[in-house]
Amino acid sequence: MRKLLISLALAIPVFAVDHNLLQKGYEVYKKHCSACHIERATPEQIKKFRMMAMRGEKLPIAAPPMNEVSARVKKFYPGELEFITFVKDYITNPSREKGVCMPMAFKLFGVMPPIGKALSEEEKEAVAYWLYHNYKESWKEMMRKMHGKMMH
């Protein structure tokens, strides 16, 4: 029991969230990302957006919601370091080839502009960190809520 408690005590800092970095990331999001990406959409809203798109209607959003972006990127890059590395690279040099969006997202929104080129390394790190830690829902869970069943 004592070994378990010591192990847990040593592991806590590894899993702790840096709230200052999280706040800085949110500030970067508000300043540089929120013009196109809304912060969060419910599964019902996302489903509504998809139905509108299928009918050829103009969407009330300019890019996928950030909670959907986070869940989708985590599907391919589940670890924090790999997620942050991907996001920092993608926002600096976005392309359809390295993107992980659903094909419909590229059709509706195209490839995002390279906003990362206007950000410092610290800002890119912060916004990627915020995107990773701010949203907990997995892609599978998001799809299950939208469709009422498990999807892969």
UniProtKB/Swiss-Prot annotation:
Residues where heme c binds: 33, 36-37
Protein name (database record): Uncharacterized protein aq_1854
InterPro entries hit by this protein: Cyt_c-like_dom (IPR009056), Cyt_c-like_dom_sf (IPR036909)
Keyword entries, A-Z: Electron transport, Heme, Iron, Metal-binding, Signal, Transport
Matches recorded under PROSITE patterns: CYTC (PS51007)
Domain (Cytochrome c): residue spans on this chain: 20-135
Pfam families the UniProt entry points to: Cytochrome_CBB3
GO molecular function: electron transfer activity; heme binding; metal ion binding
Naturally occurring in which organism (per UniProt): Aquifex aeolicus (strain VF5)
Upper classification of the organism: Bacteria, Pseudomonadati, Aquificota, Aquificia, Aquificales
SUPFAM superfamilies in the record: Cytochrome c (SSF46626)
Signal peptide: 1-16
